[in-house]
Structure formats: structure tokens, C-alpha cells
Amino acid sequence: MTKSPLTLYLAAPRGFCAGVDRAIKIVEMAIEKWGAPVYVRHEIVHNKFVVDGLRAKGAVFVEELDECPDDRPVIFSAHGVPKAIPAEAERRQMVYVDATCPLVSKVHIEAERHAEHGLQIIMIGHRGHPETIGTMGQLPEGEVLLVETVADVARIAVRDPARLAFVTQTTLSVDDTRDIVAALQARFPQIVGPHKEDICYATTNRQEAVKAVAPKSDALLVVGAPNSSNSRRLVEVAAKAGCSYAQLVQRADDIDWRALDGIATIAVSAGASAPELLVNEVIDAFRARFDVTVEVVETAVEHVEFKVPRVLRQPA
């Protein structure tokens, strides 16, 4: 049977960012240095395939520190943690390694610096996301107000409209955040923002690549986990950019082939915590059903690399 032709636009950049790469290395190096088990508070990154792979090597994933014994190392996830968590680990004299992405740590430092100058912080982020919890937890309760939408801006009650600063979660939609920032600046003209926006380079680059491929594709798939904020934003960006069918898939098994019946073009991207192995699996699934021509659409080249903490670079 002759296969139908299909042009597959492969968005670039896609997949692992420097912060995710570093976090995974931290877990692997910790297991190598201290042996199994090494405990990890929260999924190190939001990807089941990655987490299952590390679990097989000896990582034990827990949600809270009280699930960890005092005598085993614990790693904090790439999303960042409230200040109370390392303080508790120190009180218990635990060995811990902080795998917080350096770009998230930068937001933590910004928030603290503004607070030291007497400013109340407004955080643009998603309620309940570990990164938002971690950033808000750098300061005492009530010092950071959360806004998720433009509508929230009109509702928040601030201490002093002239003494405000804002920070953002690093994995948001660039366009949505721009609208929220504009609403904040309209309501609070004296609000102070970051020197350079907090949305990370990888989030921005992946969204721009999706915008480049979405309008010319009959469908677009984002390889990523349902709990991955940046992956879900890529699906939203694709829909807004004019792609009529944009879906999140964890791997090739999740593809709804009936929904793709009759397509001539498809685009594929991947969230920042999705390994390239899963992207290749998706491409292979299309090759099995179509006569595929792959076209890479590259909108940026990334050379960012973050060092692992010194404790893991020293011999045991």
C-alpha cells in the first residue's frame, strides 16, 4: 500500500533546556557519589520518562522532606523550593543538593532584593505550580501576591501602590505575560519590573519556534508531560498562532491517529523537560504510516550550559 506524503516540520529549538539538563545530571552524579537511594523532593523535572529512568537508577521521589530519612542525601527539584525547605534540611543535618534552575534562582534573588527595599512583590504565575510555590516561599506569607490573569490585576489589594515590584514564573506564555505586565503598569504606574524579563530563554525560544511552524501545519504535536507548564504553553501558543489541531502527547502511544486523518503537514515540538528520544519515537511513528519528509525549522541556536554544584564535582 502506498503511503500518503507528509511534510513534518520539526521545531528548533525544542526539548531539554540547560536547567533540565543540569538537574538530571545532579541526580545521576549524586547516585554515583553517594550510592542509592538518593531522595528527590518532587519530580526533578516534569517528565514521567525521565523520572522513571532515574528511579530505575536509585532515585526515590517524594513530595515532602518528612518522607526522607536524615541519613540519606536529598535533592531539591529544578523548580525551586520555599526557603523553609533547606532550613529544615539543615536543622536535621541532612546532606542536600539544590537543583533549582539558576534562572529560577535569579527570580528568587530579585524578589528578595525588592523586599529588602521595602517593596511588596506581585508574582505573575500559576497557582499551585512548584515554581510559584518556591518563589513565593522566599518571603514571609503575605509579602508576595499572585496574579494569574489580566482580570486578577484589577482585584488585588496592595499595601501601597507606589511601593510595588513584579516577578514572573519562568515558563509562562510570553504573549499572555506581556498583557498582564501592561495591566499592572496601567494600574500601578510606579511598579518596578525586572531589568530583563524573567521568562527564560528556553521558554521564549521554544514558543517562537512553535509560532514559526504552527501557521503552515495542519496539526501540531508537543511532546511533553501534562504537568509541564512550559509544554502546555506551547500547545496554547500553537493554537493562537493559527494551528487548528494542537495537542500534547507524552509519547508516540498517545497520538490520536483518527484526528490526524487526511493531514498533509504536521509540526512537532517538545517541552523543555522532554528528551529527544521521545521526539524521535514520534517521528518514527509517523514514518510507519506516512511517506515523511522532515524539515527542520530553526529560529534560534542555544549554547547555554549551567555547572552542577561544587559538592558533586568534588571526589567523595
Swiss-Prot record:
Keywords: 4Fe-4S, Iron, Iron-sulfur, Isoprene biosynthesis, Metal-binding, Oxidoreductase. One of its GO terms (biological process) is dimethylallyl diphosphate biosynthetic process. It comes from Ruegeria pomeroyi (strain ATCC 700808 / DSM 15171 / DSS-3). This is 4-hydroxy-3-methylbut-2-enyl diphosphate reductase. Its EC number is 1.17.7.4. Dimethylallyl diphosphate binds at H46, H79, H129, S228, S229, N230, S273. (2E)-4-hydroxy-3-methylbut-2-enyl diphosphate binds at H46, H79, H129, T170, S228, S229, N230, S273. Gene3D superfamilies: 3.40.50.11270, 4-hydroxy-3-methylbut-2-enyl diphosphate reductase, catalytic domain (3.40.1010.20). Pfam families: LYTB. Binds 1 [4Fe-4S] cluster per subunit. Isopentenyl diphosphate binds at H46, H79, H129, S228, S229, N230, S273. Catalyzes the conversion of 1-hydroxy-2-methyl-2-(E)-butenyl 4-diphosphate (HMBPP) into a mixture of isopentenyl diphosphate (IPP) and dimethylallyl diphosphate (DMAPP). Acts in the terminal step of the DOXP/MEP pathway for isoprenoid precursor biosynthesis.
